[in-house]
Amino acid sequence: MVEARGGLDPRRLFKAYYSLSPPVEEPRDIAYREFAFQLFDGDVYVRHIGFDSMEELLSYMAREAPKNAYYSVARYSLPTARSMEEKGWLGSELMFDIDVDSLEGCGEVLGDSCLSRGYKQAVRLVEALYRDFGVPSTLYFTGNRGFHVLADCGWCRRLGREERREIARYFTLEGLRLELIIPRPGRRGVRPAPPSPDDPGLRGWIARAALERGVDLSAVHEAIEDLLDDVRVAIDVKVTQDISRLARIVGSLNGKAGLLVARLGLEGFHPGDWLSPFRGEVEFRASARLEESRILGRTVSLEPGRVYSMPAHIAVLLQLKGYGAVAGGEVVVRAAAGWRPL
């Protein structure tokens, strides 16, 4: 239990969490990964760290209580070296990043509706990777406003920056020549075959999107812009092409929201208190206005100068977002036994 009378130091909460055997997942081939941490003291980043075992990693996190914790999608022969040449690159996982603030109408506030939209895009990406490339992948919530999809297969580990960029462009539809995918009728009235849900690649995705919208497959051109919006995935191309990118450690806390980095399934994503280890009822003094929003399953609105009673996990998130500060109460940090399986 962490007392919040007179204010709440987020580092104390994070330290309490990491001391309770949290559900942190071990990255594959841990000894070949570079680790990096952002600390609370001056927001300093510490990089080029290596661990030989999960015990070493957990001990470090319990001692330092990092604000953010990362590992490299790359494997290196010497991960603690300071230059790429010295590290000895052995291959990288294929990583995709979806940030919901890039979606129309979504901004800094962690609204459930925007998270739901981002999740649906991430699921679409996972399904397309498997259907079109034969690559299984794993979906994660980043603990703030985004989702990561990671694929770790033999051939994709060896891809260079340009190959990764082309795969990313496939999902963003950048450079798409639609006339080659869905040709229009010819001058003599010859009508090309309409797309089918069983077609490979983009034709199949457009056909399935059309059926979901109730659009006749022979008339997809009339609704093509909406259909392209339905199949496009708003990933950050720069993230995918970067072979030295860092991913968040699953089970760690995101210092921008105080929420878990969580592995997700494809059956649905319902933001709620299960994403936070913090429990209790606290007082929160608002310093900024917040329009009514649905956050982690609760409706929240704020007016500057007012004091609100609210659940600790909501208050911690709002404090880290800069909407005010916890002014009183007690926060209970859950032990590992209470976790929903990740």
Swiss-Prot record:
Cofactors that this protein relies on: Mg(2+); Mn(2+)
SUPFAM superfamilies from the UniProt entry: Prim-pol domain
InterPro entries: DNA_primase_S (IPR002755), DNA_primase_ssu_euk/arc (IPR014052), DNA_primase_ssu_PriS (IPR023639)
One MF annotation (Gene Ontology) recorded for this entry: metal ion binding
Gene3D superfamilies assigned: DNA primase, PRIM domain (3.90.920.10)
Keyword tags: DNA replication, DNA-directed RNA polymerase, Magnesium, Manganese, Metal-binding, Nucleotidyltransferase, Primosome, Transcription, Transferase
EC number: 2.7.7.-
Magnesium in keyword set: yes
Keyword Glycoprotein (UniProt): no
One Pfam short name: DNA_primase_S
A GO BP annotation: DNA replication, synthesis of primer
Active site (catalytic residues): D97, D99, D236
UniProt-listed CDD domains: AE_Prim_S (cd04860)
One Gene Ontology cellular component: primosome complex
Function statement: Catalytic subunit of DNA primase, an RNA polymerase that catalyzes the synthesis of short RNA molecules used as primers for DNA polymerase during DNA replication. The small subunit contains the primase catalytic core and has DNA synthesis activity on its own. Binding to the large subunit stabilizes and modulates the activity, increasing the rate of DNA synthesis while decreasing the length of the DNA fragments, and conferring RNA synthesis capability. The DNA polymerase activity may enable DNA primase to also catalyze primer extension after primer synthesis. May also play a role in DNA repair.
Assigned protein family: Belongs to the eukaryotic-type primase small subunit family.
Record NCBIfam families: PRK00419.1-3
Subunit structure: Heterodimer of a small subunit (PriS) and a large subunit (PriL).
Name the record gives this protein: DNA primase small subunit PriS
